[in-house]
């Protein structure tokens, strides 16, 4: 797909992320795999003011085009693509319930079968590191080895998928799961969870069932 169309999709995803209540202000960032690198949102520009020309290209060596400043979190986007060759889009936000669970430094367990949408029987929580650092990107790379989404301790959420629409869908789904988890925790701890065997069945079914979006 040509660059301007991808840039427009990035902007539309950012606006939809805000509309869904997953983000606010200039928090969060969005990227797509492009050529030997990626296209990513810039730093410090409110989503409603973004234009296609603001979207930044970063090559596979981490070098960005002159005259533009990429999101400070570009390193963990790059790490996500390296860790997940099947991913072509990454969405990061500070959704309230995901962030609340991350503050507890807990993974989201298998409280509902939709946990399998992220690729396993839980959604991990990557250890805290200062935003924008290589250390944080290393935590992200490890957490995404066997998952399509991870919480970031005291920070937020990352979701990656085959395209932007699927990545945003997954981010929204994880936020709902986080809300369910916090609601259940208010009643009992530990919470009842599905067994690994039950989640394995769901994972198998998800191979032929789920969100259908043209690539």
Curated annotation (Swiss-Prot):
Protein's recorded name: L-fuculose phosphate aldolase
GO molecular-function term, one example from the UniProt record: L-fuculose-phosphate aldolase activity
Pathway terms, separated by semicolons: Carbohydrate degradation; L-fucose degradation; L-lactaldehyde and glycerone phosphate from L-fucose: step 3/3
Residues reported to bind substrate: 28-29, 43-44, 71-72
Cofactor(s), by name: Zn(2+)
Catalytic activity: L-fuculose 1-phosphate = (S)-lactaldehyde + dihydroxyacetone phosphate
Organism: Escherichia coli O6:H1 (strain CFT073 / ATCC 700928 / UPEC)
EC numbers for this chain: 4.1.2.17
Gene field: fucA
């Amino acid at each position: 797909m040509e660059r301007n169309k991808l840039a427009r999709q990035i902007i539309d995803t950012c606006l939809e992320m805000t509309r869904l209540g997953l983000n606010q202000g200039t928090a969060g960032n969005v990227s797509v795999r492009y050529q030997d690198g990626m296209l990513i949102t810039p730093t410090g520009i409110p989503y409603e003011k973004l234009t296609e020309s603001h979207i930044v290209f970063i090559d596979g060596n981490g070098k960005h085009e002159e005259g533009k400043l990429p999101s400070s979190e570009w390193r963990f986007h790059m790490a996500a693509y390296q860790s997940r060759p099947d991913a072509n889009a990454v969405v990061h936000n500070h959704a309230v319930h995901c962030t609340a669970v991350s503050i507890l430094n807990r993974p989201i367990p298998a409280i509902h079968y939709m946990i399998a949408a992220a690729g396993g029987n839980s959604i991990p929580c990557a250890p805290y590191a200062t935003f924008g650092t290589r250390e944080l990107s290393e935590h992200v790379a490890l957490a995404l080895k066997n998952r399509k989404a991870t919480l970031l301790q005291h920070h937020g959420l990352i979701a990656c998928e085959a395209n932007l629409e699927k990545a945003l869908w997954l981010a929204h789904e994880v936020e709902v799961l986080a809300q369910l988890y916090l609601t259940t925790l208010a009643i009992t701890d530990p919470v009842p969870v599905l067994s690994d065997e039950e989640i394995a069945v769901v994972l198998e079914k998800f191979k032929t069932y789920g969100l259908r979006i043209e690539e």
